Amino acid sequence: MEDTFRHKGLRKKMVEDLLARVEIEGLDRQTVAEKKRQVCRAIEEVPRHCFIDTAFDSFAYQDRAFPIGDGQTISQPSTVLAQTVLLDVNPGDKILEVGTGSGYQAMVLERLVAKVYTIERHKEVNLRTKQLYTAHGG
């Protein structure tokens, strides 16, 4: 699926909203602020609409979860932001993600670290995600 100027604009707006709205506790304020900016830059690079069914394309950049098959969902962007900030990842880190799902979280993580290893137990979700992941630089 193409990443159009419309999608990029919606993604930029979503990131601005996430930066302003999402509060994260568990790390000191300065670290949280810095990590939020880093993670939001990574989120802005990943075309979320490519990781969901085209039926949801118009809603891809809302802070909502969407079904991806086999009873699984793609997490809402605020959840991806909070989880990733709290992981406190750094360049050169290696990440093991259990439960690949759509592959969106792994793509965000890959923008921040050297290597992401991810496994998925649902065969259909896994096959679809492998194709998406490869198509988008994973």
How would you name each of these model-derived features?
Residues 13, 82, 128:
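Alpha-helical scaffold segments in soluble metabolic enzymes
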Residues 48-80:
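Class I S-adenosylmethionine
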